Amino acid sequence: MTRILLIRHAHSVANDRGILAGRSAGVILTEHGSKQASDLAERLKGVAIAKIHISPLERCHLTINPLLKKIPVKNRPKIVITEDLSEVDYGKWTGKKLVSLYRDKLWKVVQDRPSAMYFPDGEGLANVQVRAMRAVHTAANESGLQIIVSHGDVIKSIVAAVLGTHMDNFQKIVIDPASITVLDFDGSNFRILTLNNTSTPIAELAKIVSKKRPARALLGGGAGRKRK
């Protein structure tokens, strides 16, 4: 059983200005985002992390830095930077204000048929899902708790894939800045334990339960977590 935490970067200056940052350099966190990153470190306090898989973009690294500072150097998890977790290449849309993009004829495609969307001089959202799931499967084949730090649309594509829903339902999924989504992988199937969580301590959900038989979904919904 592998447990994976999907973390979206905290609130950035591009989020604040309503700009589609894409892969632009120098996109840092706002004051609010820095507070979110500190709160995230508190929420993950005491969690034994085996490895962190992270986008190469600065805002993701700034999000996870407060957590790393709380971990003694000798105990810090290995960090793997992977392009598969990078932000969507929005091509010519990069750096533009979202309000101006609403008027673009392709905006309706993004909203209604994201599987068909290919950003001008950029990449297609369907391609994003393929590379994102490649990173997830890499993490799932590792031992111990894995953390993935990435971007909103990338994580939305992962959630859609894990749920087995069509990519055209992608926009029905919400992933907020500094949110945590928790996945379990039993060797053949993924399950979502929590989605877009921005407030509760995560240590209990981060625990990996070792069982001879992998956990299965129960009819009737199951009894929930054991009460202490």
Language-model features: locations:
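General small-molecule cofactor/ligand-binding pocket signal
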Residues: 5, 80-82, 193
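Residue-level preference for the first positions of well-ordered beta-strands
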Residues: 4, 143-149
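Active-site metal-binding loops of divalent metal-dependent hydrolases
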Residues: 10, 145, 152
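Short, basic/glycine-rich phosphate-binding loops at helix/coil junctions
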Residues: 17-20, 105-117
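Acidic, low-complexity terminal tails and accessory targeting/binding regions
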Residues: 2-3, 69, 88-99, 161-228
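Phosphate-coordination/substrate-recognition cap region in phosphate-metabolizing enzymes
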Residues: 38-108
